[in-house]
Regions:
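Loop-centered beta-sheet repeat module
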Residues: 114, 118-164
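Membrane helical hairpin/interfacial module
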Residues: 12-77, 84
Length: 283
């Protein structure tokens, strides 16, 4: 999620944007290389329901790279072509993955198999709408947004029903962070449409903020627990929620102070998670 955070902070510092983008590439490329080299091992790991539902974040990062297509203006034609190709490959792979996951886990549906991270899986495709300002695929972004609304209506009640009936194990409580996924729907709406219907935007913002507060309630306990790669879900959704507020400020100016607070919190938690990743891989 460093790609998105770097782009957001680019409004305040171009240098900071480039630094975060560079760190994101340094972290992303080895991860992608490891996935390709150890595909068989990862394929076995993806048979785990929880791991499988979080995996799409790797593809979402591939789509987010396109926000850095202008990092070298003198090579724009080349970098734009590279990043657009990566965007399409990630987009197609994400749709294919959703189909495969659905066939595997929805065919014989069990409520106990549903985790909050299903929101990332099925709503994560909203990255295609978020990146419309860079891709120019406005019609695709609008179509995806309609899907996101429908997915949100089906997913949230299902997820909360699962949590109410079955709870969630302590060792995977970091998965609760993915409850912030509706914020991505708000960002998708803001980026894909020229005309914004304020009541709809306000409804999405209120919903995302309610879930954000829920995640913050559990965040201290999550961060105190033993680090695992699932912590990335925490940073991803907290940053998206802050980005949603940033866009909403153009329509509801009173949200600016709240946006700054959430951005700072997202940065602090990101630092904690990056440190955890460094220790995780060095050990």
């Amino acid at each position: 999620m460093l790609f998105s955070l770097g782009n957001t902070l680019g409004d305040y510092s171009t240098l900071l944007r480039d630094i975060l983008g560079g760190i994101a590439f340094v972290l992303y490329l080895p991860l992608l290389t490891a996935f390709v080299k150890s595909f068989k091992n990862y394929r076995l790991a993806l048979k785990n329901l929880l791991t499988a539902s979080i995996f799409p974040t790797l593809l979402m990062q591939g789509m987010l790279m396109i926000v850095y297509q202008d990092v070298f203006p003198e090579w724009y034609g080349f970098t734009e072509g590279i990043f657009r190709t990566i965007w399409w490959l990630s987009f197609i792979a994400l749709i294919s993955y959703i189909v495969i996951f659905s066939k595997r886990f929805l065919w014989n549906f069990e409520l106990s198999n549903v985790f909050p991270s299903w929101a990332v899986l099925y709503i994560g495709i909203g990255i295609s709408s978020l990146t419309v300002p860079w891709t120019g695929y406005s019609q695709l972004g609008k179509t995806i947004f309609i899907y996101l609304l429908l997915a949100l209506i089906v997913l949230l009640p299902t997820i909360f029903l699962r949590l109410w009936k079955h709870g969630i194990p302590d060792d995977v409580k970091s998965n609760l962070a993915t409850l912030c996924a509706p914020a991505l729907v708000a960002v998708a709406y803001l980026n894909a449409f020229e005309t914004i219907y304020r009541p709809l935007l306000l409804g999405l913002i209120i919903l995302s903020q309610m879930l954000y507060l829920t995640v913050l309630y559990f965040a201290p306990g999550i961060l105190k627990s033993l680090f695992n790669p699932g912590f990335s879900a925490l940073t991803f959704l907290l940053i998206v929620t802050a980005i949603a507020l940033k866009g909403a400020v153009n329509y509801f100016e009173g949200l600016y102070f709240l946006y700054v607070i959430e951005l700072v919190l997202a940065i602090l938690i990101l630092i904690r998670v990056v440190a955890g990743y460094i220790n995780y891989f060095t050990d």
